[in-house]
Design a protein with these regions (language model features):
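Basic, helix-initiating cap at the start of DNA-binding domains
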Residues: 1-20, 24-36, 50-53
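Short hydrophobic/aromatic patch on the recognition helix
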Residues: 35-45
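Hydrophobic/aromatic residues within well-ordered alpha-helical segments
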Residues: 48, 59, 63, 84, ...
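Hydrophobic alpha-helical connector segments
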Residues: 54, 58, 65-98, 149-152, ...
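All-alpha amphipathic helical-bundle segments outside canonical DNA-binding/catalytic cores
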Residues: 79, 117, 135-151, 169-178
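Short secondary-structure transition hinges
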Residues: 93-127, 134-138, 146-147
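C-terminal peripheral helix-coil segments that are non-catalytic and often amphipathic
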Residues: 128-132, 136, 169-208
């Protein structure tokens, strides 16, 4: 079976999910959106749940590659943090919080994929970043990196909780940015603050 066609179905499903949430989108909707028969759709995915799991896995693999690229190309831990912020802006600005809610409530297997990724990749990567920052003198040495790494990842989930931050009142990206900036400045030493300000000012002047 064609990998290109499978990827096209995943991309088409993601497009509709981001617009309307997962629960309200049917396999009929996806087939119609892609201009293909539902029979063709079911050649690749037995049901919507399987499609959602495939979509989550694809995006998590992409996120892991981006994280590794940022680590490899950044000169120090503060530059990593700034580049992570820019990467996060791209991701969070297109995420519909309803999608997060639907995955948690209706697709537990897909949500488990994310939880495993968080435990195996994200928390470990953040712990290593914090340790490296302490060695470089930019992150406060009094921090417990395990606690801070877990706290940060749960902050992200909280930011997408629509019962706390209703989408009618809050921009998901602005919420995530505020939480991330609060975290970054909270963990930095004075020299870390200075470098963080330098990078932020440079990014702001480029964007203007």
């Amino acid at each position: 079976m064609s990998t290109d066609q499978k990827d096209r179905i995943i991309a088409g499903g993601e497009e509709l999910f981001m617009q309307a949430g997962i629960k309200s989108v049917t396999m009929d909707d996806i087939a119609r959106h892609l201009g293909m028969s539902k029979k063709t759709l079911y050649q690749f995915f037995s049901d919507k749940n399987e499609l959602v799991i495939a979509l989550i896995k694809k995006n998590l693999n992409k996120d892991e590659c981006q994280i590794h690229q940022i680590i490899e190309t950044s000169g120090n831990v503060i530059e990593e943090m700034i580049n992570m912020m820019k990467c996060s802006e791209e991701i969070y600005s297109r995420i519909n919080p309803i999608v997060i809610h639907d995955i948690q409530k209706y697709h537990p297997d897909a949500w488990k994929e994310f939880q495993n990724f968080k435990a195996d990749v994200l928390i470990n990567t953040l712990e290593q970043l914090l340790k490296k920052g302490i060695e470089q003198g930019f992150i406060r040495p009094d921090l417990d990196v395990k606690i801070l790494a877990k706290m940060r990842l749960n902050q992200v989930e909280m930011g997408f909780n629509t019962s706390i931050f209703p989408v009618t009142e809050f921009s998901p990206w602005k919420v995530q940015y505020q939480l991330l900036e609060h975290f970054n400045y909270g963990i930095c030493t004075l020299s870390g603050h200075e470098l963080l300000d330098q990078y932020k000012n440079a990014v702001t002047s480029i964007s203007n």
